[in-house]
A protein has these predicted regions:
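Structural alpha/beta surface segment adjacent to cysteine/selenocysteine redox centers
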Residues: 1-75, 161
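C-terminal cap of thioredoxin/glutaredoxin-like
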Residues: 59, 63, 67-164
């Protein structure tokens, strides 16, 4: 991915009409705004920000994840932009100077590389993806699919024998 990102249409990366309509419907039903910008950002800086926040604690990590998601899909902002990401970090009270240093030092590159290698090993070819026990679910899935996978995961020999 080039640092400036790329066009989804030009590189045939856009969602299918069916998937896009499903995502829009789910967002509408949940009361969430959903923009689908053509620009696909290089998200390395955003992922680094997320890892910085993970190390700062669960509460900050969750808040940062939500703010990044809202910036992209709620407001259509470029997650490859340092200014956008520093604005997100500042709005959450995060240490923007240390985050800038983390980017410059490539502090979380090894960790992000390990996540990427694990995803490739598991066969993740697209996002979103969820690994539920030994079942890999790739792509946007209805709630019931995830619920059913969790149900299968929760079956133990004892519960199978008792019928629970």
């Amino acid at each position: 991915m080039p640092p400036e990102g790329l066009s989804a249409k030009e590189h045939e990366l856009a969602h299918s009409e069916r998937v896009e309509e499903y995502l829009r419907r789910v967002a509408r039903e949940g009361g969430f705004p959903l923009l689908m910008p053509d620009h696909v950002p290089n998200t390395h800086l955003a992922l680094t920000l997320g890892e910085w926040a993970r190390d700062a604690g669960e509460e900050r990590h969750v808040a940062t994840h939500r703010a990044i998601f809202d910036a992209r899909y709620g407001r259509g902002l470029d997650l490859g932009s340092r200014q956008v990401l520093l604005g997100i970090a500042a709005s959450l009270g995060l240490d923007t100077q240390d985050i800038s240093r983390a980017w410059d030092e490539r502090r979380f590159d090894e960790r992000l590389g390990q996540f990427r290698h694990l995803a490739l090993y598991l066969g993740v070819a697209a996002t979103p993806a969820a690994l539920v026990c030994n079942e890999l679910l790739i792509g946007s899935r209805p709630y019931q699919v995830l619920s059913d996978a969790l149900g299968r995961c929760m079956v133990t020999p004892a519960s199978a024998e008792s019928g629970d």
